[in-house]
Amino acid sequence: RAGKKLLAAKNLMTDPEQAKKFVHLTGVDSLGVAVGTLHGPMKIFKRLPKIDFERLSDIHKKVKIPLVLHGGSGVPVADLKKAAKFGVAVVNIDTELRLAYLAALRWELARQKKEYDPRVIFAPVVKALTVVVEEKLRALQN
């Protein structure tokens, strides 16, 4: 049964030859690829995304344009650094940003119960988001 699930998951990933053909036919300047990451908050609580680096490398060699990693929340920084070496130039991390935002906002609202100025409350929240974004940008620098 596990073998069938693995086979089904592989069928949902980007086929390097199809990616090459798609890029050639459309002339797109970047390509979102399915290489093992997942969208949405549920994945963060169930398992860490596991990037198929062999597939990613093969796609990168064939298409020679920047690649986009959707569902990048929760991907370890070391994996993002490695993915950048295989052409990943954009990583979508919406879920990770939402979680950081809500955690910081809840913390500040609990900590500053009498504060009424949103600028005071939101300054640390923005800082929390900045920390996440800076970490990802550092990981993707070549």
Predicted features along the sequence, with ranges:
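Extended, intrinsically disordered, low-complexity segments
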Residues: 108-142
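Flexible, active-site-adjacent loop/turn segments at secondary-structure boundaries
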Residues: 33, 40, 73, 95, ...
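Alpha/beta enzyme core
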Residues: 1-63, 77-88, 99, 103-107, ...
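Hydrophobic faces of well-ordered beta-strands that scaffold small-molecule active sites
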Residues: 31-33, 67-71, 89-93
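Glycine- and other small-residue-rich loops at beta-strand/loop junctions that grip anionic moieties
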Residues: 8-11, 44-48, 69-72, 94, ...
